[in-house]
Protein backbone atom coordinates (compact mmCIF):
# COMPACT_ATOMS: atom_id res chain seq x y z
CA UNK A 1 0.00 0.00 0.00
CA UNK A 2 2.77 2.42 0.75
CA UNK A 3 4.43 1.86 -2.61
CA UNK A 4 1.99 4.06 -4.57
CA UNK A 5 2.65 7.31 -2.70
CA UNK A 6 3.82 10.04 -5.04
CA UNK A 7 4.84 13.57 -4.24
CA UNK A 8 2.57 16.22 -5.77
CA UNK A 9 4.18 19.00 -7.69
CA UNK A 10 2.89 22.59 -7.81
CA UNK A 11 0.29 23.84 -10.22
CA UNK A 12 1.75 23.74 -13.71
CA UNK A 13 -0.87 24.95 -16.20
CA UNK A 14 1.31 24.03 -19.15
CA UNK A 15 1.34 20.41 -18.10
CA UNK A 16 -2.39 20.34 -17.35
CA UNK A 17 -3.51 22.24 -20.45
CA UNK A 18 -5.43 20.22 -23.04
CA UNK A 19 -3.21 21.73 -25.72
CA UNK A 20 0.18 22.14 -24.08
CA UNK A 21 1.71 23.52 -27.31
CA UNK A 22 -0.67 26.51 -27.19
CA UNK A 23 0.66 27.63 -23.80
CA UNK A 24 3.41 29.72 -25.42
CA UNK A 25 1.00 31.48 -27.81
CA UNK A 26 -1.23 34.46 -27.08
CA UNK A 27 -1.20 36.52 -23.95
CA UNK A 28 1.16 35.40 -21.30
CA UNK A 29 2.58 36.73 -18.11
CA UNK A 30 4.34 40.04 -18.53
CA UNK A 31 8.06 40.03 -18.05
CA UNK A 32 10.00 42.97 -16.72
CA UNK A 33 12.21 44.42 -19.44
CA UNK A 34 15.82 44.71 -18.42
CA UNK A 35 17.29 48.09 -19.17
CA UNK A 36 20.65 49.57 -18.55
CA UNK A 37 20.25 52.29 -15.91
CA UNK A 38 23.09 54.33 -17.38
CA UNK A 39 21.06 54.92 -20.56
CA UNK A 40 18.07 56.15 -18.53
CA UNK A 41 20.20 58.79 -16.82
CA UNK A 42 21.41 60.11 -20.17
CA UNK A 43 17.87 60.32 -21.52
CA UNK A 44 16.61 62.30 -18.53
CA UNK A 45 19.43 64.84 -18.90
CA UNK A 46 18.55 65.32 -22.57
CA UNK A 47 14.85 65.77 -21.86
CA UNK A 48 15.58 68.42 -19.21
CA UNK A 49 17.70 70.35 -21.71
CA UNK A 50 14.90 70.16 -24.30
CA UNK A 51 12.35 71.45 -21.77
CA UNK A 52 14.52 74.47 -21.01
CA UNK A 53 14.75 75.27 -24.74
CA UNK A 54 10.95 74.95 -25.11
CA UNK A 55 10.40 77.41 -22.24
CA UNK A 56 12.43 80.05 -24.07
CA UNK A 57 10.20 79.69 -27.15
CA UNK A 58 7.04 80.37 -25.10
CA UNK A 59 8.31 83.76 -24.01
CA UNK A 60 8.98 84.81 -27.61
CA UNK A 61 5.42 84.00 -28.75
CA UNK A 62 3.74 86.00 -25.98
CA UNK A 63 2.72 88.97 -28.17
CA UNK A 64 -1.07 88.61 -28.01
CA UNK A 65 -3.20 91.67 -28.64
CA UNK A 66 -5.93 92.63 -26.17
CA UNK A 67 -9.54 91.69 -26.96
CA UNK A 68 -11.45 94.36 -28.85
CA UNK A 69 -14.79 95.36 -27.32
CA UNK A 70 -16.26 95.48 -30.86
CA UNK A 71 -16.25 91.67 -30.94
CA UNK A 72 -18.43 91.35 -27.83
CA UNK A 73 -22.10 90.69 -28.64
CA UNK A 74 -24.53 92.88 -26.76
CA UNK A 75 -28.28 93.17 -26.98
CA UNK A 76 -31.14 90.70 -26.86
CA UNK A 77 -29.77 88.05 -29.20
CA UNK A 78 -28.92 85.65 -26.39
CA UNK A 79 -31.36 83.15 -24.89
CA UNK A 80 -29.60 82.23 -21.66
CA UNK A 81 -31.88 82.68 -18.71
CA UNK A 82 -34.83 83.51 -20.94
CA UNK A 83 -38.08 81.76 -20.06
CA UNK A 84 -39.75 80.18 -23.08
CA UNK A 85 -43.49 79.48 -23.03
CA UNK A 86 -43.83 76.34 -25.13
CA UNK A 87 -47.64 76.29 -24.90
CA UNK A 88 -47.85 79.77 -26.39
CA UNK A 89 -45.45 78.73 -29.16
CA UNK A 90 -47.60 75.67 -29.96
CA UNK A 91 -50.75 77.80 -30.05
CA UNK A 92 -49.14 80.30 -32.40
CA UNK A 93 -48.19 77.46 -34.75
CA UNK A 94 -51.80 76.25 -34.78
CA UNK A 95 -53.00 79.77 -35.48
CA UNK A 96 -50.63 80.00 -38.44
CA UNK A 97 -52.19 76.85 -39.93
CA UNK A 98 -49.32 74.49 -39.13
CA UNK A 99 -50.74 71.17 -37.93
CA UNK A 100 -48.82 68.22 -36.57
CA UNK A 101 -50.08 66.05 -39.45
CA UNK A 102 -48.74 68.37 -42.15
CA UNK A 103 -45.24 66.98 -41.93
CA UNK A 104 -46.26 63.37 -42.62
CA UNK A 105 -45.23 62.04 -46.02
CA UNK A 106 -47.79 59.29 -46.66
CA UNK A 107 -48.10 60.12 -50.34
CA UNK A 108 -44.33 60.11 -51.00
CA UNK A 109 -43.27 57.89 -53.90
CA UNK A 110 -39.57 57.14 -53.92
CA UNK A 111 -37.48 56.53 -57.02
CA UNK A 112 -36.83 52.90 -56.07
CA UNK A 113 -40.46 51.98 -55.30
CA UNK A 114 -41.87 49.65 -57.98
CA UNK A 115 -45.07 48.57 -56.25
CA UNK A 116 -48.27 48.39 -58.29
CA UNK A 117 -50.01 50.73 -55.85
CA UNK A 118 -47.46 53.43 -56.50
CA UNK A 119 -47.72 53.04 -60.29
CA UNK A 120 -51.45 53.70 -60.15
CA UNK A 121 -50.92 57.00 -58.34
CA UNK A 122 -48.67 58.35 -61.11
From Swiss-Prot:
UniProt xrefs under SMART domains: CHZ
Pfam families assigned: CHZ
Keywords: Chaperone, Nucleus
GO cellular component terms, semicolon-separated: nucleus
Start-end of Acidic residues biased regions: 39-63, 97-122
Chain segments annotated as transmembrane: none
Residue spans of biased composition, Basic and acidic residues class: 22-38
Compositionally biased residues, Low complexity: 12-21
InterPro entries attached to this UniProt entry: Histone_chaperone_domain_CHZ
Region (Disordered): 1-122
Localisation per UniProt entry: Nucleus
Keyword Nucleus appears in the UniProt entry: yes
Keyword Nucleus among record annotations: yes
Assembly and interaction partners: Forms a heterotrimer with H2A.Z-H2B, stabilizing the association of the histone dimer. Also, with a lower affinity, forms a heterotrimer with H2A-H2B.
Family: Belongs to the CHZ1 family.
Job description of the protein: Forms a chaperone-bound H2A.Z-H2B complex that acts as a source for SWR1 complex-dependent H2A to H2A.Z histone replacement in chromatin.
Name the UniProt record assigns to this protein: Histone H2A.Z-specific chaperone chz1
Organism: Aspergillus niger (strain ATCC MYA-4892 / CBS 513.88 / FGSC A1513)
Amino acid sequence: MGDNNQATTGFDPAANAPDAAAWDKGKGKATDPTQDMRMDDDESDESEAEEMIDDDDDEDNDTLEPISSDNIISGGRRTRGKTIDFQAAAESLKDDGMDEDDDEDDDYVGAGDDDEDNKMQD
